[in-house]
Curated annotation (Swiss-Prot):
Gene3D superfamilies registered for this protein in UniProt: 3.30.300.30, ACP-like, alpha/beta hydrolase, N-terminal domain of ligase-like
Domain Carrier: 597-675
Family, as annotated: Belongs to the ATP-dependent AMP-binding enzyme family.
Keyword Oxidoreductase attributed: no
Field pH dependence: Optimum pH is 7.5.
PANTHER family: LONG-CHAIN-FATTY-ACID--COA LIGASE, SURFACTIN SYNTHASE SUBUNIT 1
UniProt keywords, alphabetically: Phosphopantetheine, Phosphoprotein, Transferase
Pathway it works in: Secondary metabolite biosynthesis
The protein, known as: Atromentin synthetase greA
Organism of derivation: Suillus grevillei
Length: 958
């Protein structure tokens, strides 16, 4: 009989996986979190907690010793008592910075309250209000501790008791309590911290962790990591996540280890910062999910100029979780780390993929492995063995109890002292999550082989995109509304193809029409396009496959449901191949109805280039195909430009002409004009049509201060089949086109261009950065002409810009542009100016040129002369803004704000952006968006930005 897959880990077994030969010693065994902070202060008073905020530089690390932090939070806890809340009251902590969250949590604990960490609220008003109301009902009351920004986000919900952290800090200044003061002596089984689930399958549940569950987890984690009081730990995971607060804060605190907590945006915006911090702070333990490992590797493996630049010998372990870790990605990352190191032979660390959930205090199963010395056996890294005290087993998912043999897949269940005790005020959900014997049903499908676990799927209704869980039921609800889909005969199922780095999904559905009918191709094409559009707009990802299955062949369970697991199984076995083939046949037929075969040699050559970029058959390419409707991105534009120039032997095909001529036949005509040297200087037209499909009101987007509009390409594709998207590009890029000399000249030109493109209102105008004030003036001009402007979008720009324009000299403008283009890091853009200013322009350009990644220069087709000219264009726009003084008003403004170039986000909003209200006749809207000033529309942030932006358009009736 095969062995049964039940695994537990003892101290002896775990020792094999300790990443350091040092012994992890906890001086005493604390029973509560109160004991943890007291012990840390007594034993290591001068060890430090460091913080890098969302807007700080590497040199701006704010630190507090354990002793100073302890005194600070106890004073805050004393001030909290003035709220008059009874012991055990739940306080919802809604803050963004690590230090603020950490401070608030400890203050709540010491005051005898129970903190509940609230992740970022939805940008969708209805969803946000529904969630906050749910939290209020769940806890029976609603006490929130937040910032001014957070308070503004929840001010539309009545019945909340809101306290500002800034006011609490002021109140605490009058107290100096004893270093061991507490308002309440906690007990091990008291509720300690509540964590909210993602809410991916409905409203969030509140996971209850006691002092006992948290300490059981943290002790075992620290032993697994080999932590000591001399360790240095780096964390950038948000504090509202169990990995950030428990795994990377309380665990090292338990062992007396110093910590550095970095805002996630600081790492994502500048991946090199992670390496600099490992080098400068001798970091031993860090965390990086698969998508960050992949991003770091892509960004750094070609930076040959950085090879040998860092001392990375201190790093011993990098934990990874949130999504499966691709083995090849882990190996490439480890190899790149060695190349970047000053002493590659001294670099020896493990990448430890792991399994954990909010319900298990984050990671409880790990597989630390040196991926360069030990080649992974599977496509994804194994997840390993349980930490001390944790057990795991694989069972039949139907009954949740019958054990599966070693090597056979089934439902993963875990148990141990680190597993949560219950869901707050939700006995039904708690009961359904456990089976006899105290085993917790994780909802994941796994395999245990020789004591090592790996996942093979998921029972729960979620799909993970770059580490973020999205609820499948909610997605299906919207997909069911598409014309052509038979009601209740649609299922979306997670799927990861072999070799694919991130998870995707497949849509299975039964069409309302006959797949063999006369008009089947037209209806199928429209249905699939509508399904794709909903997916992109809801979860930022199109389906990998859409499989139409006739109703009479779509089997349901006895409960009348579609089985996602069964559909995926049929797909993998090839049993749906006939339906997929029929779908492809009909879609080809639909394309054929509008198919125009490329006829000229130029059209054929461009069609071949298009096919190569989009991985399509050359025979499928039509002369009427639009580059952006095929899915073209800003990076694809550069590739098309480069390949076109090489094929036709042209010195340059201007990027703007690709944007203006995205259709094969139109671009071919332009190329032919270049080849015949018959391309006369075109009359300047600021309008660049990036997306022309859809019937809703078009959106016009004014360029940022660099004048170019390539930044909008990735945003525009989200508006396909919804509304046209036009960008306005500055004058001066093309030969014979002079720069603008005043704001009035620019606004007059742009307003006239908008009117030529869309004769009558209502209008929707937006501008990014500098373009925001231009958009405001264009909106005023259109209203003065008697037209209605229903939307004026202002992206991270204040109304008063003249002072800032006067601050920017040629050097500052050149460095801003260079950072925007990805030629230099934010760190260099901020620090180089004093050294460059005494140099000549050519010398300054030469310095930046040498710092620029060679592949980026090739990608942008830049030369020193082109960069110099581009700086002059940006400079001309700065000159136009030096005398700008806003006046008048528009019907309403929608302001979108991100992390500013300098200063805090709160100051940026309240003191710089809020004055827009004085220029809005209606209610002004202020909406927080992810990212920093220069990154809010980049590849990583545009999926979220488009959802938020489109939400505001809808709110304005567009």
């Amino acid at each position: 009989m095969a062995s049964i897959a039940v695994t537990t880990t003892t101290t002896t077994t775990t020792a094999e996986f300790v990443t350091s030969p040092r012994t992890s010693i906890v001086p005493e065994q604390p029973n509560t979190l109160h004991d943890v902070i007291a012990q840390a202060v007594d034993s290591y008073p001068l060890h430090e907690l460091g913080f890098i905020t969302s807007s700080a530089h590497d040199s701006s690390i704010q630190t507090k010793t354990f002793s100073a932090f302890n005194q600070y939070v106890r004073n805050l806890a004393r001030a909290m008592l003035e709220w008059g809340k009874p012991t055990g009251s739940v306080v919802v902590v809604y803050l963004t910075e690590h230090e603020d969250n950490m401070t608030a949590v400890w203050a709540c604990l010491l005051a005898g309250f129970v903190p509940c960490l609230q992740p970022a609220l939805s940008a969708q008003q209805a969803h946000k209000e529904g969630h906050v109301a749910h939290i209020k009902n769940l806890f029976g009351s609603a006490t929130w501790l937040t910032s001014e920004l957070g308070a503004e986000q929840i001010n539309s919900i009545s019945g909340l008791e809101v306290h500002l952290l800034s006011e609490l800090k002021s109140s605490a200044e009058k107290f100096t309590v004893a270093a061991d003061w507490v308002a309440y002596e906690a007990k091990p089984d008291d509720e300690a911290i509540l964590f909210l689930t993602s809410g991916s399958t409905g409203f969030s549940k509140a996971v209850v962790h006691t002092h006992r569950t948290i300490l059981a987890a943290c002790r075992a984690k620290g032993q697994s990591y080999g932590l000591t009081s001399e360790s240095q730990v780096l964390n950038w995971v948000g504090f509202d996540h169990v990995a950030g607060s428990l795994e990377m804060h309380i665990t090292p605190l338990l062992y007396g280890a110093s910590q550095l907590h970095v805002h996630a945006s600081a790492i994502l915006a500048d991946p090199l910062r992670l390496l600099r911090l490992i080098d400068e702070k001798s970091i031993e333990l860090a965390f990086a999910p698969n998508f960050l490992l992949s991003k770091l590797t892509r960004d750094l493996e070609k930076r040959t100029d950085l090879f040998g630049s860092f001392d990375l010998s201190s790093i011993k372990r990098i934990n990874s979780g949130g999504e499966a870790v691709v083995s090849k990605t882990a190996q490439a990352f480890a190899a790149t780390m060695k190349q970047l190191s000053k002493n590659p032979s001294a670099v020896s660390f493990v990448i430890s993929a792991g399994f954990g959930m909010t319900e298990t205090c984050a990671g409880c199963i790990y597989d630390p492995v040196d991926v360069l010395k030990n080649k992974p056996a599977h496509e994804f890294l194994d997840l390993g063995r349980p930490i001390n005290g944790c057990e795991m087993r694989i069972v039949d998912p139907e009954d949740g109890a019958t054990l599966r043999p070693d090597g056979e897949s089934g439902e993963l269940q875990v148990r141990g002292p680190m597993v949560f005790v219950r869901y707050y005020n939700n006995a039904e959900a708690t009961s359904s999550s456990f089976v006899e014997g105290g085993w917790y049903r994780t909802g994941d499908v796994g395999i245990i082989e020789n004591g090592v676990m790996r996942l093979s799927g998921r029972i729960k209704d979620t799909v993970i995109v770059h580490g973020v869980s999205y609820g499948i039921p909610e997605l299906e609800t919207y997909l069911q509304t598409v014309e052509g889909v038979t009601h209740s005969f649609l299922a979306a199922a997670p799927y990861r193809a072999p070799g694919q780095e991130t998870e995707g999904f497949i849509i299975f559905y039964s069409p309302t029409f006959d797949l063999n009918g006369a008009d089947a191709s037209t209806k199928l094409f429209a249905t699939h396009r509508a399904l794709r559009d909903i997916c992109v707009k809801m979860i930022t990802l199109p389906p990998q496959f859409v499989v139409p299955i006739p109703v009479n062949q779509m089997e349901k369970t006895t409960l009348g449901k579609l089985s996602r697991a069964r559909l995926i199984s049929l797909f993998k076995q090839g049993q749906l191949a006939q339906h997929i083939a029929r779908s492809e046949e009909l879609l080809s037929e639909a394309r054929g109805a509008t198919f125009v075969a490329p006829s000229t040699e130029t059209e054929k050559a461009l069609a071949k280039i298009y096919a190569g970029i989009f991985n399509l058959a050359e025979s499928e390419m039509s002369a009427s195909d639009n580059f952006f409707e095929l899915g073209g991105t800003s990076i694809d534009v550069i590739r098309l430009k480069r390949e076109g120039e090489a094929h036709f032997g042209l010195p340059e095909i201007p990027t703007i002409q690709i944007l203006k001529h995205p259709v094969v036949s139109s671009l071919a005509n332009y190329v032919n004009a270049l080849l015949s040297k018959d391309s006369q200087t075109e009359e300047y037209d600021p309008i660049v049509p990036l997306q022309l499909t859809g019937n809703k009101t078009p959106i016009f987007f004014v360029h940022p201060g660099v004048g170019e509009v390539l930044i909008f390409v990735n945003l525009a594709k989200y508006f396909q089949n919804e509304r046209p998207f036009y960008a306005l590009r500055a004058r001066g890029f093309e030969p014979g086109h002079p720069f603008f000399t005043s704001m009035d000249e620019m606004v007059s030109c742009y307003a006239a261009a908008v009117k030529r493109t869309q004769a009558t209102g209502p209008y929707a105008i937006a501008g990014y950065s500098y373009g925001g004030v231009v958009a405001f003036e264009v909106a005023k001009r259109l209203e003065a002409m008697g037209d209605e402007v229903k939307f004026t979008g202002l992206i991270n720009i204040p109304p008063h810009i003249a002072d800032r324009m006067h601050e920017i000299d040629w050097t500052g403008g050149m460095l801003n542009l260079s950072y925007f283009l990805g030629l230099v890091s934010k760190h260099d853009a901020n620090d180089l100016a004093p050294a460059l200013r005494p140099m000549t322009r050519n010398e300054q350009l030469e310095v930046v040129w040498k710092l620029s990644p060679p592949e980026r220069l090739v990608e942008l087709q830049l030369t020193p002369g082109k960069l110099d000219h581009w700086v002059d264009i940006a400079g001309s726009l700065i000159e136009c803004g030096k005398d700008y003084n806003p006046s008048g008003s528009v019907s309403a403004v929608d302001v979108f704000y991100a992390i500013p170039l300098r200063g805090s986000k709160a100051d940026w909003l309240n003191n710089q952006l809020k004055p827009w209200s004085g220029f809005s006749r209606g209610d002004a809207s202020y909406t927080d968006v992810p990212g920093q000033h220069y990154t809010l529309m980049d590849f990583d942030h545009v999926p979220q930005f488009q959802k938020i932006f489109r939400g505001r358009l809808e709110a304005r009736g567009l």
